[in-house]
Amino acid sequence: MEQAPEDQGPQRKPHNEWTLELLEELKNEAVRHFPRIWLHGLGQHIYETYGDTWAGVEAIIRILQQLLFIHFQNWVST
């Protein structure tokens, strides 16, 4: 009978800790490429829409990833 493999890898960080670290890295990168007033407005919109929730954190991560991807894609192709 098949058995699930035992967990032999290193312990992973908790999801919420990893998510907050990712958000911090994305914010630091976004500040280097976009005006702070835009980013502040985006943060305000997310907060007004989602409040102080994990859904808001996930939304801002998704939007920052998309913005940075498009920014770099356009920058490299021109």
Swiss-Prot record:
Post-translational modification note: Phosphorylated on several residues by host. These phosphorylations regulate VPR activity for the nuclear import of the HIV-1 pre-integration complex.
Acyltransferase in keyword set: no
Stretches the record annotates as Homooligomerization: 1-42
Entry GO terms, CC: host cell; host cell nucleus; host extracellular space; virion component
UniProt keyword annotation of Ion transport present: yes
Pfam families recorded: VPR (PF00522)
Major localization listed first in the record, in broad terms: virion
Protein location: Virion; Host nucleus; Host extracellular space
Top-level taxon in the UniProt lineage: Viruses
Any single biological process term in GO: regulation of DNA-templated transcription
Disulfides per UniProt: none
UniProt keyword list: Activator, AIDS, Apoptosis, Cell cycle, Host G2/M cell cycle arrest by virus, Host nucleus, Host-virus interaction, Ion channel, Ion transport, Modulation of host cell cycle by virus, Phosphoprotein, Transcription, Transcription regulation, Transport, Viral penetration into host nucleus, Virion, Virus entry into host cell
Note from the entry: HIV-1 lineages are divided in three main groups, M (for Major), O (for Outlier), and N (for New, or Non-M, Non-O). The vast majority of strains found worldwide belong to the group M. Group O seems to be endemic to and largely confined to Cameroon and neighboring countries in West Central Africa, where these viruses represent a small minority of HIV-1 strains. The group N is represented by a limited number of isolates from Cameroonian persons. The group M is further subdivided in 9 clades or subtypes (A to D, F to H, J and K).
Record note on quaternary structure: Homooligomer, may form homodimer. Interacts with p6-gag region of the Pr55 Gag precursor protein through a (Leu-X-X)4 motif near the C-terminus of the P6gag protein. Interacts with host UNG. May interact with host RAD23A/HHR23A. Interacts with host VPRBP/DCAF1, leading to hijack the CUL4A-RBX1-DDB1-DCAF1/VPRBP complex, mediating ubiquitination of host proteins such as TERT and ZGPAT and arrest of the cell cycle in G2 phase.
Physiological role: During virus replication, may deplete host UNG protein, and incude G2-M cell cycle arrest. Acts by targeting specific host proteins for degradation by the 26S proteasome, through association with the cellular CUL4A-DDB1 E3 ligase complex by direct interaction with host VPRPB/DCAF-1. Cell cycle arrest reportedly occurs within hours of infection and is not blocked by antiviral agents, suggesting that it is initiated by the VPR carried into the virion. Additionally, VPR induces apoptosis in a cell cycle dependent manner suggesting that these two effects are mechanistically linked.
Family statement drawn from the similarity comment of this UniProt entry: Belongs to the HIV-1 VPR protein family.
Record's protein name: Protein Vpr
Native source species: Human immunodeficiency virus type 1 group M subtype B (isolate BH5) (HIV-1)
